[in-house]
Amino acid sequence: MSACQTPLIVALDFPTRDAALKLADQLDPALCRVKVGKELFTSSASGIVESLCAKGFEVFLDLKFHDIPNTTAMAVKAAAEMGVWMVNVHCSGGLRMMSACREVLAKRSGPQPLLIGVTVLTSMEREDLAGIGLDIEPQEQVLRLAALAEKAGMDGLVCSALEAPALKAAHPSLQLVTPGIRPAGSAQDDQRRILTPRQALDAGSDYLVIGRPISQAADPAQALAAVVAEIRS
């Protein structure tokens, strides 16, 4: 497997295996990792992960597991056995759920995936949280969940880059994975709390997830190269 030399993760947000692999064939695994989400995994099952790994990519399995502790832990274990590089769970599942995931990984031999907690989805704003009974700012809820994640021994968090400075200050050991990244001039789409790649890295993000600006570009390889140039400038 080629070691990726950048913090970039390209989201393979496609409905079919063929479409995802068509994009992957245009990308360099030395310049990016790839993310497999719910739609693609549901349509393609574990075979898509195997195919991407065979092409040299490190895979972030973005299924945001959230269930009772044992069920979630077994799902995380299954993901590890597929050979994924990163897997995530919802921090809102609680301390016992996250701790169970950490423990099940510690008991297995071989490479360990990064275990990442999802705090507040980047599409959510204060009014969205209020609608589910949380009358607080997203940043406050992120910090609450981050404290639980660190206590459970998680490797990092998915968060908006706008939350990254506060998270790095409070929890410097946690690696921060930031979606909602848009190169300068890109449309915001359905991600609300966004920054450019350079801004996100400067804010403290460790990994950057980029989707449509690369996946829907006329030339995805060129679009990826432009983002790499931006973060290296």
UniProtKB/Swiss-Prot annotation:
GO molecular function terms listed in the Swiss-Prot or TrEMBL record: orotidine-5'-phosphate decarboxylase activity
Pathway given in the UniProt record: Pyrimidine metabolism; UMP biosynthesis via de novo pathway; UMP from orotate: step 2/2
SMART domains: OMPdecase
Keyword set, alphabetical order: Decarboxylase, Lyase, Pyrimidine biosynthesis
GO BP terms, alphabetized: 'de novo' pyrimidine nucleobase biosynthetic process; 'de novo' UMP biosynthetic process
Catalytic activities: orotidine 5'-phosphate + H(+) = UMP + CO2
Record bears the keyword Zinc: no
EC number: 4.1.1.23
Entry-linked Pfam families: OMPdecase
Residues binding substrate: 13, 35, 62-71, 122, 182, 191, 211-212
List of catalytic residues: K64
SUPFAM superfamilies with a match to the protein in the record: Ribulose-phoshate binding barrel
InterPro entries: Aldolase_TIM (IPR013785), OMPdecase (IPR014732), OMPdecase_AS (IPR018089), OMPdecase_bac (IPR047596), OMPdeCOase_dom (IPR001754), RibuloseP-bd_barrel (IPR011060)
GO cellular component labels: cytosol
PANTHER family listed in its UniProt record: OROTIDINE 5'-PHOSPHATE DECARBOXYLASE
Subunit (UniProt): Homodimer.
The family this protein is said to belong to: Belongs to the OMP decarboxylase family. Type 1 subfamily.
Protein role: Catalyzes the decarboxylation of orotidine 5'-monophosphate (OMP) to uridine 5'-monophosphate (UMP).
Protein name as annotated: Orotidine 5'-phosphate decarboxylase
Organism the protein comes from: Pseudomonas putida (strain W619)
